[in-house]
Amino acid sequence: MSGTPIRGTPGGTPLSPTRISRLQEKEELRQLNDRLAVYIDRVRALELENDRLLVKISEKEEVTTREVSGIKNLYESELADARRVLDETAKERARLQIEIGKLRAELEEFNKSYKKKDADLSVAQGRIKDLEVLFHRSEAELNTVLNEKRSLEAEVADLRAQLAKAEDGHAVAKKQLEKETLMRVDLENRCQSLQEDLDFRKNVFEEEIRETRKRHEHRLVEVDTSRQQEYENKMAQALEDLRNQHDEQVKLYKMELEQTYQAKLENAILASDQNDKAAGAAREELKEARMRIESLSHQLSGLQKQASATEDRIRELKETMAGERDKFRKMLDAKEREMTEMRDQMQLQLTEYQELLDVKLALDMEISAYRKLLEGEEERLKLSPSPSSRVTVSRATSSSSSSSTSLVRSSRGKRRRIEAEELSGSGTSGIGTGSISGSSSSSSFQMSQQASATGSISIEEIDLEGKYVQLKNNSEKDQSLGNWRLKRQIGDGEEIAYKFTPKYVLRAGQTVTIWGADAGVSHSPPSVLVWKNQGSWGTGGNIRTYLVNSDGEEVAVRTVTKSVVVRENEEEEDEADFGEEDLFNQQGDPRTTSRGCLVM
């Protein structure tokens, strides 16, 4: 220990050795008192630190126990829900299997009906083939009949030509008959004229004969009477022969002309009758052939319609079976995907639970290590802890809206940040505060959030750094957000607004996060949207974010208010400043949750 030089009295009188010894002892005692005071202060500070650490450890144990019990209850409820969902899925799967069995039975019935219809179709196709053969045969017969018809028509045409020729011949013969009749009349007239001429000449000849006889009577008195009679007889005979020959020629010519005309007329009539009979028979055969063709055509069209209807029914049954098969395959795939998602979700929850257990175990080990260090120091110093700090925790809850508070506390040479848990409350905030008596002043600022909603859509979360805003559909129905606007105003600054697309729909129970363009998040609708025209939502002291529907009505709002608090402490600046609260941080990426504990 170094000594302090002893000076003389002001008057210059030297001090006695006893006085010097007393002064040295006094100085040494003062130094020892100072060291003792420093030691006592240090011990007091250590005791306060031990008390603070013990309180923190107890609170950490309480928080850890509460968190573990809460997480345990949460996961037990989630596991119960998962088991319930699995049971419902199993029931649904059993129901679907029963339905699949029914559908398989129906499918078998459809297959049997299809086979029956197929057999009927085969029979119908065989019948169609037979009818086609019959149709081809009928077509062949029809072709034959048509050929016969054409030949008969040709014959009829020939007969008509012959009839025309016969009619022409008949007309010619008629004309010839008329001519011959005229000739006969003319000949008869000529014959009559000749007869009259003959009679006249006969009379003339007789008169001449009489005159000649009279003349010869005078001349031939001597002529024999027999010779005169002979000459008269010869002359009469010659005249009679000439008359008979002329009559025979006229009768023969008349008879021949009448026979020729009658024969030609009878031949023409017979040919016309035969042609009429042949044409009538051809018409009857053609009519019968047409009737048979029409009957076969009707039968064929009926069978074709029946076959087409059967094919349409078979096609409809096949399409129905394919549709039902695809439908049940899709349902099974959807159920399998749901079960896979549930398994993945359960595995993720189990992983998070395991991570939380690992964090709890690490915290327990760290707390145990600090407890052992403190107990060892207390035993070494033989000190007993004297708690001199007071910790108060206050919470308020309600049921209509939610709010959160962030408390940041500053002191000389130290800065601590305590973030409070977001609680449900109507215009209230859940905050945690801690106080230690001291003499130095401290300042803090408080961030409080208040949220409310009049419909099913609420502003679930906002980033204090202006990266994103998250909305949630709290109902069990899909909500259309077409042409809705999400607006934000910071203080008295300019209002910014994000407009949803006309066809955007927020699914039931789902959330959507609208990120700024500078956040570096990729656009992945419908759950992640990027505001490409705006880099950030902005930050500031007083932030008001609200959702407006297509009618201009405000349906949800969330406000963030920042306030500064200054406190005076009664301890010296070397004494510790203390504040503690359960921490659930709202800042950062909403897709990840960070939980931790810091031991100051």
UniProtKB/Swiss-Prot annotation:
Occurrences of domain IF rod (ranges): 25-381
Pfam family name, one: LTD
Region described as Disordered: 377-449, 568-600
Ranges for region Coil 2: 237-379
Post-translational modification: Phosphorylation plays a key role in lamin organization, subcellular localization and nuclear envelope disintegration. Phosphorylation by CDK1 at Ser-16 at the onset of mitosis drives lamin disassembly and nuclear envelope breakdown.
Any one Gene Ontology cellular component term annotated for this protein: nuclear lamina
Compartment(s): Nucleus lamina; Nucleus envelope; Nucleus, Nucleoplasm; Nucleus matrix
Protein name, as recorded: Lamin-B2
